[in-house]
């Protein structure tokens, strides 16, 4: 079974998608994860045409901010992003947890409130048959293996995106995490780092690199686990540092071919 391989366009700001998406296709990717503002993307009809022309589907769309923020305007803006994601037919709508509380230690009630917000978003998305996917990430509210386990125990409709590098940073074996959270898993991120000199909550400092450049974890084992378990959802690779502000999206897409070649050498 061939895994579906996507590219995370997290560094794109004002890309010419009519040129950048064909470059991703040429680099060998099957789809792309989008994070751009709606006013840049334009109507779904327009974006669908651009994607179809490039044979490069939008596989995942992301939130702007986190669901624990209950401000009415913030929630409404993200509902519009969910509306858009549903009309585009994406596989899932990804979000992360928010920042840690200021001036005090985090408490269990903070995680409970965060999970409650995620479930409210998931309930809204469910009208479209759209799934939410919580992306684990260091230095945010949920910031340890224990926090992660607690948070997932509080979710029902909202599902999970495991970024295997962040699992590894929390000293949670990436392969084991896939197995342990399999029933909630609907998306996977691949990311690589060359070093991390501080491994304390809120202070992790990984030096991100393109997947395969440092091999901070056993990517072959991760991908084989997904293949052996017949994972049918998307697996998306993330670019590394330096941040690509100033580099046009086409150049970045062309350069991403090196990362795609690495994954092919692993058999994927």
Residue ranges and their predicted role:
Residues 18, 70-160, 254:
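Active-site acidic/histidine proton-transfer and metal-coordination neighborhood
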Residues 10-16, 34-46, 65-75, 101-105, ...:
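Acidic-and-aromatic substrate-binding clefts and catalytic sites of carbohydrate-active enzymes
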Residues 33, 60, 94, 133, ...:
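Conserved beta-strand positions in the central sheet of alpha/beta enzyme cores
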Residues 46-53, 117-125, 177, 222-225:
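Catalytic-core regions built around general acid/base machinery
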Residues 1-28, 145-149, 153-158, 168-268:
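Histidine-acidic metal/acid-base catalytic patches
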Residues 1-91, 126, 159, 183, ...:
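N-terminal pre-domain/capping segments
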Residues 62-65, 97-99, 205, 239-241:
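Short, histidine-centered active-site or binding-site loop motifs used for metal coordination
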Residues 56, 90-91, 130, 229-233:
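A short helix->loop->beta-strand "cap" motif at the edges of active sites that frequently abuts
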């Amino acid at each position: 079974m061939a895994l579906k391989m996507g590219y995370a366009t997290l560094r794109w700001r004002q890309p010419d998608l009519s040129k950048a998406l064909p470059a991703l296709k040429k680099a060998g990717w099957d789809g792309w994860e989008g994070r751009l503002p709606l006013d840049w993307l334009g109507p779904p009809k327009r974006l669908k045409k651009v994607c179809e022309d490039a044979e490069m589907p939008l596989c995942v769309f992301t939130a702007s901010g986190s669901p624990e923020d209950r401000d009415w305007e913030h929630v409404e803006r993200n509902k519009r992003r969910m509306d858009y994601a549903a009309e585009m037919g994406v596989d899932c709508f990804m979000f992360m947890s928010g920042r840690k509380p200021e001036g005090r230690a985090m408490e269990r009630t903070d995680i409970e409130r965060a999970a409650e917000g995620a479930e409210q978003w998931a309930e809204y998305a469910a009208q479209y048959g759209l799934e939410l996917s919580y992306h684990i990430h260091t230095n945010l509210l949920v910031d340890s293996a224990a926090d992660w386990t607690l948070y997932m125990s509080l979710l029902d409709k909202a599902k999970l995106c495991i970024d295997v590098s962040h699992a590894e940073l929390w000293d949670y074996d990436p392969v084991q995490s896939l197995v342990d959270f399999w029933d909630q898993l609907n998306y996977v991120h691949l990311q690589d780092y060359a070093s991390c000199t501080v491994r304390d909550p809120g202070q992790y400092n990984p030096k991100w690199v393109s997947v395969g450049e440092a091999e901070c974890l056993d990517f072959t084992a991760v991908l084989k686990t997904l293949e052996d378990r017949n994972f049918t959802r998307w697996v998306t690779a993330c670019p590394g540092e330096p941040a690509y502000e100033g580099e046009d999206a086409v150049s970045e897409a062309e350069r991403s071919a090196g990362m795609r070649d690495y994954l092919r050498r692993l058999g994927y």
